[in-house]
UniProtKB/Swiss-Prot annotation:
Keyword Transcription regulation: yes
Pfam families: Homeodomain, HoxA13_N
Residue span of region Disordered: 1-24
Role according to the record: Sequence-specific transcription factor that binds gene promoters and activates their transcription. Part of a developmental regulatory system that provides cells with specific positional identities on the anterior-posterior axis.
UniProt-listed GO biological process terms: positive regulation of transcription by RNA polymerase II
Protein name: Homeobox protein Hox-D13
Length: 333
């Protein structure tokens, strides 16, 4: 019996040792498979612990003297299943991770085109590719070192996320990038329109603009001041730079003229002659109803009247005589 127990124990120990070696062999391929990935220490220790537990169970069965026929097979299967479970439970790291070559750019999925953008490293400007679903070229914004638009970097002021929302053809990107300008004191780009002066608006969109019509000195703004149906300033010699024309609005009209004929149409207000002037004119008319140039000048100097006023008075005086004569004829007849 002792010999049989010894043989059975040896037979049980042999499968146990073979199972432990198979478990170690099963664990070894897992380690070789994960050579490029992070090592999993927990899985290795658990596999070794399972092999040691199987060997201890076989040794205990041999020591008790009852070597059941399926003990070694169950121990070997348990160790192999534990090692396979460890290999299956360990996450497989991406050992074949694709690293782009130094001279090539990272490839994007075929369905999503690449969006060009750049970074400043030192004194150079490098472009990369970024999948945003926008049809832009890889080097759309690539230029010489210190590439900028208007003296400022593109990626600092241009909103790349805004470009992703709208579909822009690849051939229009360089042209559009040239049209965008930047002010030094403003952080947002504005669209430059050639042929116009760049000015910053000081009025808001809802604020009304009040523009007053300011007339120049000596400018006769008839239509702006009073309209065509109103009275017209009728002074013979209009003074230049008068305060009356400084304002173009009817409410601001200054009524400080001495003759008060601002709103009169036609002749100026009649000024009656003095008795001395009338006496001198009547004496000259009694001598001769018609005057010549020399006589007109002499009367003008004596009466302090203009030559035109003297001429008009003589005309009116002749018309008055005709009326008197016509009335006398009517009374006689």
């Amino acid at each position: 019996m002792d010999g049989l127990r010894t043989d059975g124990g040896a037979a049980g120990a042999a499968p146990a040792s073979s199972s432990s070696s198979s478990s170690v062999a099963a664990a070894a391929p897992g380690q070789c498979r994960g050579f490029l990935s992070a090592p999993v220490f927990a899985g290795t220790h658990s596999g070794r612990a399972a092999a040691a537990a199987a060997a201890a169970a076989a040794a205990a069965a041999a020591a008790s003297g009852f070597a059941y026929p399926g003990t070694s097979e169950r121990a070997g299967s348990a160790s192999s299943s534990s090692s396979s479970a460890v290999v299956a439970a360990r996450p497989e790291a991406p050992s074949a991770k694709e690293c782009p070559a130094p001279g090539t750019a990272a490839t994007a999925p075929p369905g999503a085109p690449a969006l060009g953008y750049g970074y400043h490293f030192g004194n150079g400007y490098y472009s990369c590719r970024m999948s945003h679903g926008v049809g832009l070229q890889q080097n759309a914004l690539k230029s010489s070192p210190h590439s900028s638009l208007g003296g400022f970097p593109v990626e600092k002021y241009m909103d790349v996320s805004g470009l992703a929302s709208s579909s822009v053809p690849a051939n229009e990107v360089p042209a559009r990038a040239k049209e965008v300008s930047f002010y030094q004191g403003y952080t947002s780009p504005y669209q430059h329109v050639p042929g116009y002066i760049d000015m910053v608006s000081t009025f808001g969109s809802g604020e009304p603009r009040h523009e007053a019509y300011i007339s120049m000195e000596g400018y006769q703004s008839w239509t702006l001041a009073n309209g065509w149906n109103s009275q017209v300033y009728c002074a013979k010699d209009q003074p230049q730079g008068s305060h009356f024309w400084k304002s173009s609005f009817p409410g601001d009209v200054a009524l400080n003229q001495p003759d008060m004929c601002v709103y009169r149409r036609g002749r100026k207000k009649r000024v009656p002659y003095t008795k001395l002037q009338l006496k001198e004119l009547e004496n000259e008319y009694a001598i001769n109803k018609f005057i010549n140039k020399d006589k007109r000048r002499r009367i003008s100097a004596a009466t302090n009247l203009s030559e035109r006023q003297v001429t008009i008075w003589f005309q009116n005086r002749r018309v008055k005589d005709k009326k008197i004569v016509s009335k006398l004829k009517d009374t006689v007849s």
